[in-house]
């Protein structure tokens, strides 16, 4: 989608494959253009729904669950400076070649049902209650596949909660992700060099955080075998810290990109 629109004036892309420092710079530019009334079209993944403080007159969101739609709507007229009739949130169905995952398809189906019932007040408490009630009914025991709630319930009378077992079983995202440090600018390169010679991590980890992206563990292994990343100070810290070698795989528009890396299998690239 971005590739088809990038020739237009004021088109930007936001993704979790950009390090936080990169995203911050992009957002600063985006906010400036919005403030000045300049053309501004942002094509983003769902990361923009996670509390990003931007205010658009129009938001277009691919079909998803009502909670995701509500989060996307929060980027429209966020500052309340426009009249409601001048603020628009459009929900669209992607074309067939961009078929959504089965999980998202179910949530979208429930959302459409709620739209039919609450078309005039989609973000009301009643609409949101109806949405989650139907989702819970359809998903049933699938919501607690690891029986965490059952363990909590069984331990309730004795207060002997198996916290360690619950912590081991609970995982919001099943895919194992690993941080990769991006030598995005001179500051990042200096921090990486400091890490090479550090005996203790100290405050370096916090300073490096804005320069990391999260990638699947399998992709990290493939990148390492291909010589595109390196372990930093492995003697001291083991296999904790990896850095991208150069910026050939990091695009100034789209962030970390591996489109030309044929050795990475498709299933390793799902983010």
At which residue positions do the language-model features occur?
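Conserved interdomain linker/interface between the two RecA-like ATPase lobes of SF2 helicase motors
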Residues: 1-2
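C-terminal helicase lobe and adjacent C-terminal extensions/tails of nucleic-acid helicase motors
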Residues: 5-24, 31-32, 60, 64-65, ...
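Beta-edge loop/turn motif
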Residues: 11, 42-48, 52-56, 178-183
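Well-ordered alpha-helical segments embedded in enzymatic catalytic cores
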Residues: 25-29, 46-47
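Conserved two-lobed SF2 helicase motor
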Residues: 33-49, 61
């Amino acid at each position: 989608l971005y590739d088809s629109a990038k020739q237009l004036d004021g088109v930007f892309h936001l993704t979790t494959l950009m390090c936080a420092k990169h995203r911050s710079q992009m957002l600063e530019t985006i906010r400036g253009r919005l403030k000045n009334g300049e053309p501004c079209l942002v094509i983003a993944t769902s990361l923009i729904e996670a509390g990003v403080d931007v205010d658009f007159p129009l938001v277009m969101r691919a079909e998803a669950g009502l909670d995701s739609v509500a989060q996307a709507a929060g980027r429209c007229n966020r500052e309340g400076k426009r009249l409601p009739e001048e603020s628009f949130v459009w929900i669209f169905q992607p074309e067939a070649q961009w078929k959504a995952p089965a999980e998202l398809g179910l949530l979208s189906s429930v959302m459409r049902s709620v739209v039919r019932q609450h078309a005039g007040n989609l973000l009301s408490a009643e609409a949101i209650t109806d949405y989650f009630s139907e989702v819970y009914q359809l998903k049933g025991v699938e919501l607690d596949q690891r029986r965490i709630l059952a363990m909590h319930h069984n331990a309730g009378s004795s207060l002997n909660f198996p916290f360690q077992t619950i912590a081991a079983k609970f995982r919001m995202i099943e895919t194992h992700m690993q941080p990769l440090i991006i030598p995005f600018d001179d500051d990042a390169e200096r921090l990486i060099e400091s890490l090479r010679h550090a005996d203790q991590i100290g405050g370096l980890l916090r300073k490096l955080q804005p320069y990391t992206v999260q990638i699947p563990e399998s992709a990290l292994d493939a990148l390492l075998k291909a010589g595109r990343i390196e372990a930093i100070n492995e003697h001291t810290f083991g296999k904790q810290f990896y850095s991208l070698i150069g910026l050939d795989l990091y695009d100034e528009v789209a962030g970390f990109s591996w489109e030309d890396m044929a050795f990475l299998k498709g299933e390793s690239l799902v983010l």
